[in-house]
């Protein structure tokens, strides 16, 4: 039989000095759901993009298994990935994922900018070409001028926009290489 002793007295002063952070159950659930969504994003990545993200062995294995799973098994695997993410530092993972997503957004913005440049070249003609050559003096003026005139003729005659596409391709090749 064990002897029962007195309960240790609490030192209220030291307890008040320690900062206790209470986290509600709802907040814990929100954080867990957020980590599960992060895990789902990892599962949806391509193999090359997944290799760019710093994942430990267990997490990488769980993500690859979730890719092969279907329906209910995939849901359970996503739960497991969320659990693994709770025990790891997710900031490097989020940073790498943001870089991958932003790279895609930047590429889309660049392609949209090229489309606008092409539209401006075709609508303004030589004025647009002069403005473009100020920014990119290495471009072939004669070739671009011929493409612009061909695109304008195609537009007037309701022909397929072959030169219109060629302008875009020329801009894309030249500007993206630079």
Curated annotation (Swiss-Prot):
The keyword Cytoplasm applies. GO terms for molecular function: ribosome binding; rRNA binding. The lineage of its organism: Bacteria, Pseudomonadati, Pseudomonadota, Gammaproteobacteria, Pasteurellales. The keyword Ribosomal protein does not apply. It is found in: Cytoplasm. NCBIfam families: PRK05255.1-1. SUPFAM superfamilies: PSPTO4464-like. Member of a network of 50S ribosomal subunit biogenesis factors which assembles along the 30S-50S interface, preventing incorrect 23S rRNA structures from forming. Promotes peptidyl transferase center (PTC) maturation. One of its GO terms (cellular component) is cytosol. It comes from the Bacteria. It comes from Mannheimia succiniciproducens (strain KCTC 0769BP / MBEL55E). Its main location: cytoplasm. Keywords: Cytoplasm, Ribosome biogenesis, RNA-binding, rRNA-binding. GO terms for biological process: assembly of large subunit precursor of preribosome. Belongs to the DarP family. This is Dual-action ribosomal maturation protein DarP.
